[in-house]
């Protein structure tokens, strides 16, 4: 399929949208010409305790990076997500919890959620947690995790959610960095039929003497498994809730008070504690959730992410609840008990909007029509994609098979550091190009620069930067502002550097070509790994592909491809040659893979991102310098890839 395919805006989408093409153009223009006026107006969508006077006070100067929005205003996030909805929709369902086991589900109304949050906020205070203290949340995808997040915001504590798949070492590092006072966890997590010993992992993490800031562990009962207990330190969630009072006034917080820390892996060294603050983040989360998904009251919204990632923070919890939405919290994985799980959940809860990741889409696509066998799917109105660029083939499959060729797709591009979507087509405003993140959201000013930082105009490819601040932007890295400046503002002076490369086409649409450190340079030709991967996945027998550079005596860099075949397809030398020719035909001779290695599985983080760093090391036979693989979803994959690589070397 050519990258130039254009899917026009659906008439149904235009008929019901908040933002048609003309509205987008007018609002976008206003947002970049007069950001103060634009955001002053948009900020009225949330409740303020003390209204702000100042709107935007921001500097990207690398000697003085300082980002403040609505700084003299005060508010409370939990009030905005709960209390203000009670009069109108107290009995509406706020959270639909869908357990790992399809038989488990629970509905929690706004009134019930409000009561639980007030109780747990009081319980936290009883454990000596106060404004400005950091609470680490290491939990499965259960309602208590959302209650814990909102309870922190109610009393002004800062939460740091750590994904439940991270190892004790990774957890300890994240506790030490922010000097956490309390850890909230569960006896075990359940995911894809497997149990994770969360409480045991916390115990293990806390054997590190540097975690001495932790005073208490609060434990939810998820499976009832036997766990070790330290009576001086450990306390049951249920015991606290039984005695907690159900009224708790929300704490008045400054717009620039910290809301949460979320750790994201640095390409080197220790994880970065990305810090988001209260006012700007909530305004931006709420506005993007409404406009990107054209969210209307009463709709059922399902973002499949984990709350351990920024997507879960912004589009399971804060955006939807600020907007009074019904949001789905899914404990499981898309292919358990079988590959029809996503389709079944859509029908069971009459989901209107589905927001998921390319890795989940490709897993379904590998099973073909079986993924939606027997499903109705008619409740769906809009699809979304997040996490990495989606290859055009996967986009098209998602559009035709899951969305029945009638649901627009919002292919959103953003980062932990950006708080919420920065680029996406809007369903009622922009024709869709499969694989393109399309246009910037309101207030976002993207640009392409060459390696010297010179702006490139028109249709071109380069480093993607953002020229001015937006309210959802991270303010710093916790405890390390210098690293924040060095990472994002030093490379290109006066600009926020995203770390991504991008191409802008003749229509002004943006195409993310992958991390700049994932760029291949083959005989002087720059090529994004995403481009080669897309071509490979376009082959009918290929489920997934990961491309890395390898040293090549003649070309400088060669192209090394790891290929996962569709179920039922056998690898062979003939197929290997066929795939090489296929990519050559799709992109050109310069993109012909030098090596194809069959890979039944790829090393992925728990959020589904492929760890190309590990793949580069294996391709170079540097097996003993792989670094930390504890954060992988399935570390066993690595050993298999090493053995295959060794046998290829020997052959």
Curated annotation (Swiss-Prot):
InterPro entries to which the protein is assigned, alphabetical: Ac_CoA_lig (IPR011904), ACAS_N (IPR032387), AMP-bd_C (IPR025110), AMP-bd_C_sf (IPR045851), AMP-binding_CS (IPR020845), AMP-dep_synth/lig_dom (IPR000873), ANL_N_sf (IPR042099)
Keyword Acetylation: yes
Top EC category: ligase
Record-linked Pfam families: ACAS_N (PF16177), AMP-binding (PF00501), AMP-binding_C (PF13193)
Catalytic activity, reaction form: acetate + ATP + CoA = acetyl-CoA + AMP + diphosphate
GO biological process, one term: acetyl-CoA biosynthetic process from acetate
Cofactor(s) needed by this chain: Mg(2+)
GO molecular function, one term: ATP binding
Modified residues (N6-acetyllysine): 609
GO CC term (a single one): cytosol
Entry coiled-coil feature ranges: none
Binding annotation for CoA: 191-194, 311, 335, 523, 584
Keywords: Acetylation, ATP-binding, Ligase, Magnesium, Metal-binding, Nucleotide-binding
Function: Catalyzes the conversion of acetate into acetyl-CoA (AcCoA), an essential intermediate at the junction of anabolic and catabolic pathways. AcsA undergoes a two-step reaction. In the first half reaction, AcsA combines acetate with ATP to form acetyl-adenylate (AcAMP) intermediate. In the second half reaction, it can then transfer the acetyl group from AcAMP to the sulfhydryl group of CoA, forming the product AcCoA.
Listed NCBIfam families: Ac_CoA_lig_AcsA (TIGR02188), PRK00174.1 (NF001208)
Protein name per the record: Acetyl-coenzyme A synthetase 1
Species, as recorded: Pseudomonas aeruginosa (strain ATCC 15692 / DSM 22644 / CIP 104116 / JCM 14847 / LMG 12228 / 1C / PRS 101 / PAO1)
């Amino acid at each position: 399929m050519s990258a130039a395919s254009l899917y026009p805006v659906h008439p149904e989408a235009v008929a019901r949208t908040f933002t048609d093409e003309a509205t987008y153009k007018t609002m976008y223009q206003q947002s970049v010409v007069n950001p103060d006026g634009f955001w002053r107006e948009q900020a009225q969508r949330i409740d303020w305790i003390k209204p702000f006077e100042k709107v935007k006070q921001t500097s990207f100067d690398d000697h003085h990076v300082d980002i403040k929005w609505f700084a003299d205003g005060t508010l409370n996030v939990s009030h905005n997500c709960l209390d203000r909805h009670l009069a109108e929709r107290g009995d509406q369902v706020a959270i639909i919890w869908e357990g790992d086991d399809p038989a488990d589900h629970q509905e929690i109304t706004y009134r019930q959620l409000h009561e639980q949050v007030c109780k747990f906020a009081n319980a936290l205070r009883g454990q000596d947690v106060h404004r400005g203290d950091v609470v680490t949340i290491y939990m499965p995808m259960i309602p208590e995790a959302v209650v814990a997040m909102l309870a922190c915001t109610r009393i002004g504590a800062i939460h740091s959610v750590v994904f439940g798949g991270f190892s004790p070492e990774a957890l300890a590092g994240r506790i030490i960095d922010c000097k956490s006072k309390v850890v909230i966890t569960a006896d075990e997590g359940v995911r894809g039929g497997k149990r994770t010993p969360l409480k045991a992992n916390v115990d293990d993490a806390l054997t590190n003497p540097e975690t001495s800031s932790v005073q208490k562990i609060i434990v939810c009962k998820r499976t009832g498994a036997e766990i070790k207990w330290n009576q001086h330190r450990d306390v049951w969630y249920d015991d606290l809730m039984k005695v907690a009072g159900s009224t708790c006034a929300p704490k008045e917080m400054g717009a620039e008070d910290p809301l949460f820390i979320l750790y994201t892996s640095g390409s080197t060294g220790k994880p970065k504690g990305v810090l988001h603050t209260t006012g700007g983040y909530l305004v931006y989360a709420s506005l993007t959730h409404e406009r990107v998904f054209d969210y209307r009251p009463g709709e059922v919204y399902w973002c499949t992410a984990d709350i351990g990632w920024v997507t879960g923070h912004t589009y399971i919890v804060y955006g939807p609840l600020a907007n009074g939405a019904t949001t789905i919290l899914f404990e499981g994985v898309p292919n358990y008990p079988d590959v029809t799980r996503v389709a079944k959940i859509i029908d069971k809860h009459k989901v209107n909007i589905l927001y998921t990741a390319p890795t989940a889409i490709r897993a379904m696509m590998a099973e073909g029509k079986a993924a939606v066998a027997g499903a109705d799917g008619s409740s769906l109105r809009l699809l979304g994609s997040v996490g990495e660029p989606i290859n055009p083939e996967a986009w098209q499959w998602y559009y035709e098979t899951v969305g029945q060729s009638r649901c627009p797709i919002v292919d959103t591009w953003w980062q932990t550091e950006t708080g919420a979507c920065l680029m996406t087509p809007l369903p009622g405003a922009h024709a869709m190009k499969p694989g393109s993140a399309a246009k910037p959201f309101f207030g976002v000013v993207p640009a392409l620069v060459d390696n010297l930082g010179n702006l490139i105009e028109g249709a071109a490819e380069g480093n993607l930067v953002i020229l001015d601040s937006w309210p959802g932007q991270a303010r710093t890295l916790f405890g390390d502002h210098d690293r924040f400046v060095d990472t994002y503002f030093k490379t290109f002076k006066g600009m926020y550097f995203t770390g991504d490369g991008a191409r802008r086409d003749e229509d002004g649409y943006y195409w993310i070509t992958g991390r700049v450190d994932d760029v291949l340079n083959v005989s002087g030709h720059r090529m994004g790994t995403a481009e080669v991967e897309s071509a490979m996945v376009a082959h009918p027998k290929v489920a997934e592909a990961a491309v890395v550079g390898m040293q090549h005596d003649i070309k400088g860099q060669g192209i090394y491809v790891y290929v996962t075949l569709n179920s039922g397809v056998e690898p062979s030398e003939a197929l290997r040659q066929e795939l090489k020719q296929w990519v050559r035909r799709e992109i050109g001779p310069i993109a012909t893979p030098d090596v194809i290695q069959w890979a039944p599985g790829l090393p992925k983080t728990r959020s589904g991102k492929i760890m190309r760093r590990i793949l580069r090391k294996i391709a170079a036979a540097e097996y003993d310098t792989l670094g930390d693989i504890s954060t992988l979803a399935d570390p066993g994959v690595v050993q298999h890839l090493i053995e295959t690589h060794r046998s290829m070397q020997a052959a």
